[in-house]
Amino acid sequence: MRHVGLLVLGSFINSLGTGLTAFGLAVVMLATHGTASSAAAVQLSSFAPIVLLAPAAGALADRYDRRLMMIIGDAGSVLGLSIILLALSSPRPRLAQVCAGAVVSSCLAALTEPALRASVTDLVPREDYVRASGLLQLASAAKYLLAPALAGLLMPLIGVRGLVVIDASTCLVTVACTATVRRALRTAGARSPGARNAQAAPAQEERGAAEQAGSGGGLMAGWRTIASHPGLRLLVALMTVATLAIGVLQVLIKPILMPMVSTAAMGAIETIAATGMLVGASLVTIMKNARPTTLLAAGLAGTGAAMVLVPLGPGAWWVSACGFLTFASLPLSQAGAEVLVRGEVD
């Protein structure tokens, strides 16, 4: 777990930096262009490549050195951040240039998440998989739980360019953490190749199967699995619609609230709303014996109710409370959907 702990630390720092940049760019685009579509374009450029490239990145993580993929992804994303910094040097940053930098950074960052999660298989025994996975989820949640409030406090002091510089610095720290783990594993493997080979045997078997299937074959196999199970198709469609609705709400929150609150207050509101994820995760633990369909229905119902309530309240803190309910409901639906998917596939 020592090596996993170092990777988790790097992931936490990097996630925090990513959240700082995302918050700062959204605020600047709204202030500069005055439209929700400008903020939406930046968010789309930042997250769409990660989602679209995730299957291919996962296939690559099964075939190549995962730590090297993480180093390339984190170091390469600095290039995109440099493009964004160049755009922000203008008094009126061009939307196209900012989006281009976000796309470049996001495309390279897409390599890191699947490789990081797959590294759990390499570095920990089977009985520690759940523990390591939980640590990774907690680290990735930093961009939602801590980054907005921190960005709201820092932005009046150092500006959005300062936030982007911090983000680039966190990428380099993550590269250093990953490189340290990679070097330590190579040294340990050279000193005791027998023990290292025994530890890596399960991962090598998985990679061998993936290499035989090929990246494209793995993607097509996953698609055929979804297409051949009516229950999976319905579940994917349902979660796609729910994710789309939540994405629309997230994009519109800042344009709705920024005219009424300060940047620091906006960051605090987002952080308070995101803490609902911790409550939702606790509810999943308490309801661990509930049927997955019950979890899915409860999560989607809570999310839908919260979204309906958003425009009915009196002000910013009402929106924060509705956001809290939305994030608290998400772990329920995600846990239910994951169990249903595993049941269909297995």
Give short role names for the model-derived ranges.
Residues 1-346:
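Alpha-helical transmembrane-bundle signature of multi-pass membrane transport and export proteins
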